[in-house]
């Protein structure tokens, strides 16, 4: 089986951009996970409130909830 060697100088280097330089610090924490539950309970509460909001919108759309003074087609 034939093998091919590639010199390091022949590899194209990624182009540095201003946006990349600004975003690099955000990626420096990649792979690090804080111990414990963190903000998981807050996310659970936010998801529950969003589900309630969506169900209210759906009930209004289906005319399950009638709103006085608001005309719907």
Swiss-Prot record:
PANTHER family: PHOTOSYSTEM II REACTION CENTER PROTEIN H
GO biological process: one example: photosynthesis
One protein family per Pfam: PsbH
Keywords, sorted A to Z: Chloroplast, Membrane, Phosphoprotein, Photosynthesis, Photosystem II, Plastid, Thylakoid, Transmembrane, Transmembrane helix
Parts of the chain that traverse the membrane: 41-61
Signal sequence, start to end: none
GO cellular component: chloroplast thylakoid membrane; photosystem II
Modified residues (Phosphothreonine): 3, 5
Record-linked SUPFAM superfamilies: Photosystem II 10 kDa phosphoprotein PsbH
Function text: One of the components of the core complex of photosystem II (PSII), required for its stability and/or assembly. PSII is a light-driven water:plastoquinone oxidoreductase that uses light energy to abstract electrons from H(2)O, generating O(2) and a proton gradient subsequently used for ATP formation. It consists of a core antenna complex that captures photons, and an electron transfer chain that converts photonic excitation into a charge separation.
Subunit structure: PSII is composed of 1 copy each of membrane proteins PsbA, PsbB, PsbC, PsbD, PsbE, PsbF, PsbH, PsbI, PsbJ, PsbK, PsbL, PsbM, PsbT, PsbX, PsbY, PsbZ, Psb30/Ycf12, at least 3 peripheral proteins of the oxygen-evolving complex and a large number of cofactors. It forms dimeric complexes. Detected in both etioplasts and green leaves; PSII is only assembled in green leaves.
NCBIfam families: PRK02624.1
Organism annotation: Hordeum vulgare
Membrane topology value: Single-pass membrane protein
Similarity-based family: Belongs to the PsbH family.
InterPro entries in the cross-refs: PSII_PsbH, PSII_PsbH_sf
Record PTM text: Phosphorylation is a light-dependent reaction catalyzed by a membrane-bound kinase; phosphorylation occurs on Thr residue(s) in the N-terminus of the protein.
Origin organism lineage: Eukaryota, Viridiplantae, Streptophyta, Embryophyta, Tracheophyta
Gene Ontology MF annotations: phosphate ion binding
Subcellular location: Plastid, Chloroplast thylakoid membrane
Name of this chain's protein: Photosystem II reaction center protein H
Disordered: annotated segments: 1-23
């Amino acid at each position: 089986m034939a093998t091919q060697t590639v010199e390091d100088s022949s590899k194209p280097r990624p182009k540095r951009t201003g946006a990349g330089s600004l975003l690099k610090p955000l990626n420096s924490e990649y792979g690090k996970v804080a111990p414990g539950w963190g903000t998981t309970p807050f996310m659970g509460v936010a998801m529950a409130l969003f589900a309630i909001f969506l169900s209210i919108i759906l009930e209004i759309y289906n005319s399950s909830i009638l709103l006085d003074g608001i005309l719907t087609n």
